[in-house]
């Protein structure tokens, strides 16, 4: 059986209709013409198509755009996304004039939940562990380590706390011996803390190196040391990193990347054949062997006044057009891994494509010819189909193997324009 590929908008259109308790009007209640092809008609007309196989194919197509092999397993408890990721999503969802520095943003949490910070010779050491996995076909634009610093000071005596922060990558020896491990400096900087707040450190180069080595665990060690000698620093205050387990201030590695594998969808131009629709001599005997009497009457009726016919047909309200279709992720059982939005307006294309095809429906040459053949012999070819011709992206925040991921442009999710194909 040949592969059957449908756009994502069609996937959600079908899923929404199949979902239990769906408020969407059933096909039998449709005010459209009875001969308008919907999914049920399409399936029965194509021999050898198994419905369950089709659903699996559509699900695979949806997940492929997210670089997922399958729907992430549902955990017993819902994962609380980092506040930073929620802020990113809300920022770009509400402000359409702004856009992130990359299309894909992943957040990796600290995996070392048991090690405690230690102090030695005036240096406070914090161990961190990140399990980083970034597909090779993506380009890492930027990576930053976000640490929440806790400042404790006497506000009456001191303005702030002056500290030096060094971020090391712990490199294990070939035999795994801790005695032979080395420390690579990733960041060395000075900060002057006056209030508890987030501090951001650029570790882009290290993250690009990690990407090349494939999915693996990487150990970091944060050193905080005073810029004063120990005697002068006594009583001035403290600056620490918030390492509390299950805390909204968990250390966070945020990676910004772009997908380099997909080609941008090209806009289909209006075919010049539209301008020649009225010039076709439909009454010649050379056209498909000559029309029968019923088809001839229909063609003559269409050609009497093309403009008036278009207006009259459009006034009926059943011509091809975009109509509302709201997708609720909870209703289709995907709210366990799609964090935001809870749903969105996907729209759908409904209506009929009668000859002559209106210019605003941007028909292809194939659609125009198919409409002509249907007009001549409805048993030989069906009408052209009312389908999405332009799709818009949406932004989505979701879980990918436990990693909270934000995708700014998740292409092909909402219908922008409809046409005849």
Curated annotation (Swiss-Prot):
SUPFAM superfamilies (alphabetical): Cystine-knot cytokines
The keyword Disulfide bond is annotated on this UniProt entry: yes
Taxonomic superkingdom: Eukaryota
Leader sequence segment: 1-21
GO terms for cellular component: cell surface; cytoplasm; extracellular space; Z disc
Cystine connections: 320-386, 349-418, 353-420
GO BP terms: activin receptor signaling pathway; adult heart development; atrial cardiac muscle tissue morphogenesis; BMP signaling pathway; cardiac muscle cell proliferation; cell adhesion; heart development; heart trabecula formation
Annotated glycan sites: 67, 131
GO MF annotation: an example: growth factor activity
Main location, first listed in the record: secreted
Propeptide residues according to the Swiss-Prot or TrEMBL record: 22-313
Compartments, record wording: Secreted
Oligomer status and interactors: Homodimer; disulfide-linked. Interacts with FBN1 (via N-terminal domain) and FBN2. Interacts with ENG.
Summary of the function given for this chain in its UniProt record: Required for maintaining the proliferative activity of embryonic cardiomyocytes by preventing premature activation of the negative cell cycle regulator CDKN1C/p57KIP and maintaining the required expression levels of cardiogenic factors such as MEF2C and NKX2-5. Acts as a ligand for ACVRL1/ALK1, BMPR1A/ALK3 and BMPR1B/ALK6, leading to activation of SMAD1, SMAD5 and SMAD8 transcription factors. Inhibits endothelial cell migration and growth. May reduce cell migration and cell matrix adhesion in breast cancer cell lines.
Further facts: Does not appear to contribute to radiation susceptibility in the LEC strain.
Family classification: Belongs to the TGF-beta family.
Protein name: Bone morphogenetic protein 10
Source organism per UniProt: Rattus norvegicus
Gene that encodes the chain: Bmp10
């Amino acid at each position: 059986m040949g592969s059957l590929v449908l756009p994502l908008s069609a996937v959600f259109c079908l899923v929404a209709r199949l979902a239990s308790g769906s408020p969407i009007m059933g096909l039998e209640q449709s005010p459209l013409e009875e001969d308008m092809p919907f999914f049920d008609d399409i399936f029965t007309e194509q021999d050898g198509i198994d419905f369950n196989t089709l659903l699996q194919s559509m699900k695979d197509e949806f997940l492929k755009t997210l670089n997922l092999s399958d729907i992430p397993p549902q955990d017993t408890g819902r994962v609380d996304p980092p506040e930073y990721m929620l802020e990113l999503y809300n920022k770009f969802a509400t402000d359409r004039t702004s856009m992130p520095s990359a299309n894909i943003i992943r957040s990796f949490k600290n995996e070392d939940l048991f090690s405690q910070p230690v102090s030695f010779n005036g240096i406070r050491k914090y161990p961190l562990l990140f399990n980083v996995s970034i597909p090779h076909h993506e380009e890492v634009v930027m990576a930053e380590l976000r640490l929440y610093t806790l400042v404790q000071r006497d506000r009456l005596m001191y303005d702030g706390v002056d500290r030096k922060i060094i971020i090391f990558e712990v490199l294990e020896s070939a035999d795994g011996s801790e005695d032979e491990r080395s420390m690579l400096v990733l960041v060395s900087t000075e900060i002057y803390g006056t209030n508890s707040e987030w501090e951001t450190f650029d570790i882009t180069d290290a993250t690009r190196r990690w990407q090349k080595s494939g999915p693996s665990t990487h150990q970091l060690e944060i050193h905080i040391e005073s810029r004063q000698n120990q005697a002068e620093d006594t009583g001035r205050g403290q600056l620490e990193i918030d390492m509390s387990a299950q805390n909204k201030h968990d250390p966070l590695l945020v990676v910004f990347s772009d997908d380099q594998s997909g080609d941008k969808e090209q806009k289909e131009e209006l075919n010049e054949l539209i301008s020649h629709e009225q010039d076709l001599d439909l009454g010649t005997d050379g056209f498909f062997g000559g029309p029968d009497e019923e088809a001839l009457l229909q063609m003559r009726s269409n050609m009497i006044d093309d403009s008036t016919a278009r207006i009259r047909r459009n006034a009926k309200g059943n011509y091809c057009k975009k109509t509302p279709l709201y997708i609720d992720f909870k209703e289709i059982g995907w709210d366990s891994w799609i964090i935001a939005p809870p749903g969105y307006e996907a729209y759908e294309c409904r209506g009929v494509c009668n000859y002559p095809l209106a210019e605003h429906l941007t028909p292809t040459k194939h659609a125009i010819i198919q409409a002509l053949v249907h007009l001549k012999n409805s048993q030989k070819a069906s009408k052209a189909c009312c389908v999405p011709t332009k799709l818009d992206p949406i932004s989505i925040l979701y879980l990918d193997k436990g990693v909270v991921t934000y995708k700014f442009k998740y292409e092909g999710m909402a219908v922008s324009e409809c046409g005849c194909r």
